[in-house]
Design a protein with these regions (language model features):
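Hydrophobic alpha-helical transmembrane segments
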Residues: 42-55
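Long, non-membrane, amphipathic alpha-helices that form coiled-coils
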Residues: 1-7, 98
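N-terminal Sec-dependent export signals
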Residues: 12-15, 50, 65, 69, ...
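Canonical alpha-helical transmembrane segments of integral membrane proteins
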Residues: 19-39, 56-57
Length: 139
């Protein structure tokens, strides 16, 4: 289930990034349509000049903000994928602490629960590493 959600999220982010590129290209063309007649002394009306100019000026600013937000979201996803590494470290520390406490009490140490959990986390970390590299390519 987690694999499918990562796949869908990756696909959605990739499509969004592609749409932002297309929008930037479109805005550049619209801005060019206004600038070229100005240099050719065709003297377009003010309305024909102002609206595309505003789009040409404000459009890239809007796209820049959207791209920054998208990159911030991708970095957040990468950080979430990295959290499992921290959980694994925490689990290993808990296991070592429990082993030390049991040894102090001269009891046998049963670490099968921790071993099972550590194996589970290692599998998740391996899967997350794959998705982490895919999401990093979007940045």
């Amino acid at each position: 289930m987690e694999k499918n959600s990562n796949k869908e999220l990756f696909k959605e982010l990739k499509e969004t990034k592609h749409r932002l590129k297309i929008a930037g290209f479109t805005i550049s063309i619209m801005f060019g349509i206004v600038i070229v007649p100005m240099f050719m002394n065709l003297k377009p009306s003010y309305l024909e000049l102002i609206i595309p100019s505003l789009i040409g000026i404000l459009g890239p600013i809007y796209l820049w903000v959207e791209k920054k937000q998208l990159n911030h979201s991708i970095k957040g996803i990468i950080n979430l994928l990295d959290e499992d590494s921290g959980l694994l470290r925490q689990l290993k520390e808990e296991m070592q602490e429990k082993q030390a406490n049991l040894k102090r009490a001269n009891r046998e140490c049963d670490t099968s629960f921790f071993t099972r959990k550590i194996t589970e986390y290692k599998k998740r970390i391996a899967a997350n590493e794959y998705w982490r590299t895919k999401f990093q390519r979007l940045l």
